[in-house]
């Protein structure tokens, strides 16, 4: 049968191993990730600290599979950006135990620091080449 090898940055024992796993994911056959928000007209919004996820969505892997619950669907584009910044980012900062203002307040404070997780913003409206990005939308509340 087929052999699958995953690149799991969370299983890395050192910072160097973590960065290597993130780099290898850029040349993966398939990259799987979540989405921070989806606008009502179909734009995908993602925010990253390091940029490894948004880089892989933009370019690299042959196939990108993005999974989201219907709780990620918002109104217009500004609502999707607001959701990514004020819902997903603070929860993610808390998950990584970062000393950012949003970890305490639950809202984006536009912080600029070495610990910010809002370094890279990606707004995706179209996929080139066609069919490379597949979105799986699940009718339930998933993730943050």
Residue ranges and their predicted role:
Residues 8-31:
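Glycine-rich oxoanion-binding loops at beta->alpha junctions
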């Amino acid at each position: 049968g087929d052999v699958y090898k995953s690149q799991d940055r969370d299983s890395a024992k050192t910072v160097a191993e973590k960065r290597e796993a993130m780099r290898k994911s850029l040349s993966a056959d398939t990259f799987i990730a979540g989405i921070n928000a989806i606008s009502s007209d179909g734009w995908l919004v993602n925010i990253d600290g390091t940029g490894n996820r948004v880089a892989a969505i933009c370019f690299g892997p042959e196939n990108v599979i993005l999974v989201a619950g219907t709780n990620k669907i918002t109104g217009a584009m500004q609502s999707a950006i607001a959701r990514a910044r004020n819902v997903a980012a603070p929860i993610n900062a808390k998950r990584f135990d970062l000393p950012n203002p949003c970890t305490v307040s639950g809202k984006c404070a536009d912080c600029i620091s070495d610990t910010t997780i809002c370094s890279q913003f990606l707004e995706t409206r179209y996929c080139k080449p066609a069919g490379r990005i597949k979105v799986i939308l699940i009718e339930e509340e998933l993730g943050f």
